Amino acid sequence: MYLIFLLFFAASYSMSLSSADSVTIYEDFVQCFKNVTTISDIDLSDVVLPRTSISFTPTLRAYIRNARFNTSSMPKPSIIIVPRVDSHVQAAVICAKTLNLQLKIRSGGHDYDGLSYVSAVTFLVLDLSNFRNITVDLNDGGGSAWVQTGATLGELYYRIWEKSEVHAFPAGVCPTVGVGGHVSGGGYGHMIRKFGLTIDHVVDATIVDANGQIHDRKSMEEDLFWAIRGGGGGSFGVVLAFKVKLVTVPKTVTVFRVDKSVDENALDMVYKWQFVAPRTDPGLFMRVLLSSPTQNKTSTVNTKLRALYLGKADDVVLKMAEEFPELGLKKEDCKEMTWIQSLLWWMNHVDVDKVKPEILLEREPDSAKFLKRKSDYVEKEMTKPELNRLFQKLATLDRTGLVLNPYGGSLNVTAVNATAFPHRHKLYKIQHSVTWPDAGPEAERLYIGNLRTTYNIMTPFVSKNPRSSYLNYRDIDIGVNDHGADGYRKGEIYGRKYFGENFDRLVRVKTAVDPDNFFRNEQSIPTLPPNRR
């Protein structure tokens, strides 16, 4: 709540910011930008957008995915920079640093708590939506792609599919998520157990540092390359592009869904799922969704299982009969399809034969919703009585849910310090979720209160010392930082939860590559205090 208070406080400041002040910031920035680049005045008007620009509001709102931050009271950037080429990004960094202005970096806008486009201080937004070039090369080893960080996952999947139906990339199932944030925060999807995290397939990158210089993997050196794979790129620079290795998948994969009520032994299914899902064939990913009975107005929890199997339906039905009879999987529950179609199915398109893959190219969702998310990691199976208490409480909390994502498989064979992402050797991850339709502080207090209730209920059953969180499920409840004199101490509070023991190395890298802490946000990696450098 501390950051929300700051944001509303800042909103009054933002709205009272005199037009003279706003004009001065714009004029100073433009003069610097023109000095650093060779941009024409015509191009400049499309790249550097002041609040008075007709393109300012549509550009800002286009990639705000959480409606909580798409209101008139939220603080707005003084300028939005929409770069077209690398030199525009370099100029944005140089000029923002010269003028001591905070620079927010936005690729897809899916930061759950809005830190890529909202701040309590005067700030600029660097919108990378034009950086969406993707080059797929199937002749490079087993296949690779260079993808700019403003591209979406859907665009990446589509460009791979254009070249091959048996090549894929292991990342998220939401097609409008931006590559930049997803990859730099770790990244995962429905092939995580087979192929590991998204960052495990990153082999090169280009980044603009705090001095406006561009580096690839060789010139940035391995410490920085390590940090931007799971540590969040926005703490260290502006990542322009990633080179990723592709994976091969069968021509035919299988998806299935099983829904159960409490009367249909949903509790038994979820209990057994904890033992099977993290230990079964790595080619099988089974996600469980638990939700309060908002829609059907019953008094029981809705329990849904959604799955992808990298193989044929007959094989997974036989496997589940042996390992997971509580699921009750039947052949008629399964659908065989191509990998690209499985992504459409995961988008809730039931009849994938009637949906064209081009839908993956759509960048904007139908509408942004009001939402809040939190995360947890589970290291030991919950007992049936413990699950039963969760079910009973969840049934009373409107619009609240939990998404359980199994780990195991490839995640267990990689060291926790191989990349900056530390949460590998877990049973499963929980996403705590609440989404609501209505604006206003009363609705926000009610529904976020419900979410925090489920989060508190889970306290005894999840990781401890610290209670771990997933960076890409941004959660300002676990701590925020104004980067003052005690910035390191504040950063350590949320930093240990996101990064565990890897936090120490991340701080050392940050201090080395950005000693002035130019690249910062309310949950960025802090620098070491002067007396510890």
From Swiss-Prot:
<dbReference type="GO" id="GO:0005773">
    <property type="term" value="C:vacuole"/>
</dbReference>
<feature type="glycosylation site" description="N-linked (GlcNAc...) asparagine">
    <location>
        <position position="35"/>
    </location>
</feature>
<dbReference type="GO" id="GO:0009506">
    <property type="term" value="C:plasmodesma"/>
</dbReference>
<dbReference type="GO" id="GO:0071949">
    <property type="term" value="F:FAD binding"/>
</dbReference>
<dbReference type="GO" id="GO:0005576">
    <property type="term" value="C:extracellular region"/>
</dbReference>
<keyword id="KW-0732">Signal</keyword>
<keyword id="KW-1015">Disulfide bond</keyword>
<dbReference type="InterPro" id="IPR012951">
    <property type="entry name" value="BBE"/>
</dbReference>
<dbReference type="InterPro" id="IPR016167">
    <property type="entry name" value="FAD-bd_PCMH_sub1"/>
</dbReference>
<feature type="glycosylation site" description="N-linked (GlcNAc...) asparagine">
    <location>
        <position position="70"/>
    </location>
</feature>
<keyword id="KW-0547">Nucleotide-binding</keyword>
<dbReference type="InterPro" id="IPR016166">
    <property type="entry name" value="FAD-bd_PCMH"/>
</dbReference>
<feature type="cross-link" description="6-(S-cysteinyl)-8alpha-(pros-histidyl)-FAD (His-Cys)">
    <location>
        <begin position="110"/>
        <end position="174"/>
    </location>
</feature>
<feature type="glycosylation site" description="N-linked (GlcNAc...) asparagine">
    <location>
        <position position="417"/>
    </location>
</feature>
<feature type="signal peptide">
    <location>
        <begin position="1"/>
        <end position="20"/>
    </location>
</feature>
<feature type="domain" description="FAD-binding PCMH-type">
    <location>
        <begin position="73"/>
        <end position="249"/>
    </location>
</feature>
<dbReference type="GO" id="GO:0009505">
    <property type="term" value="C:plant-type cell wall"/>
</dbReference>
<comment type="similarity">
    <text>Belongs to the oxygen-dependent FAD-linked oxidoreductase family.</text>
</comment>
<feature type="glycosylation site" description="N-linked (GlcNAc...) asparagine">
    <location>
        <position position="412"/>
    </location>
</feature>
<keyword id="KW-0274">FAD</keyword>
<protein>
    <recommendedName>
        <fullName>Berberine bridge enzyme-like 12</fullName>
        <ecNumber>1.1.1.-</ecNumber>
    </recommendedName>
</protein>
<feature type="glycosylation site" description="N-linked (GlcNAc...) asparagine">
    <location>
        <position position="133"/>
    </location>
</feature>
<dbReference type="InterPro" id="IPR016169">
    <property type="entry name" value="FAD-bd_PCMH_sub2"/>
</dbReference>
<keyword id="KW-0325">Glycoprotein</keyword>
<keyword id="KW-0964">Secreted</keyword>
<dbReference type="InterPro" id="IPR006094">
    <property type="entry name" value="Oxid_FAD_bind_N"/>
</dbReference>
<dbReference type="Pfam" id="PF01565">
    <property type="entry name" value="FAD_binding_4"/>
</dbReference>
<dbReference type="GO" id="GO:0016491">
    <property type="term" value="F:oxidoreductase activity"/>
</dbReference>
<feature type="disulfide bond">
    <location>
        <begin position="32"/>
        <end position="95"/>
    </location>
</feature>
<keyword id="KW-0560">Oxidoreductase</keyword>
<dbReference type="Pfam" id="PF08031">
    <property type="entry name" value="BBE"/>
</dbReference>
<feature type="glycosylation site" description="N-linked (GlcNAc...) asparagine">
    <location>
        <position position="296"/>
    </location>
</feature>
<keyword id="KW-0285">Flavoprotein</keyword>
<keyword id="KW-0134">Cell wall</keyword>
<dbReference type="InterPro" id="IPR036318">
    <property type="entry name" value="FAD-bd_PCMH-like_sf"/>
</dbReference>
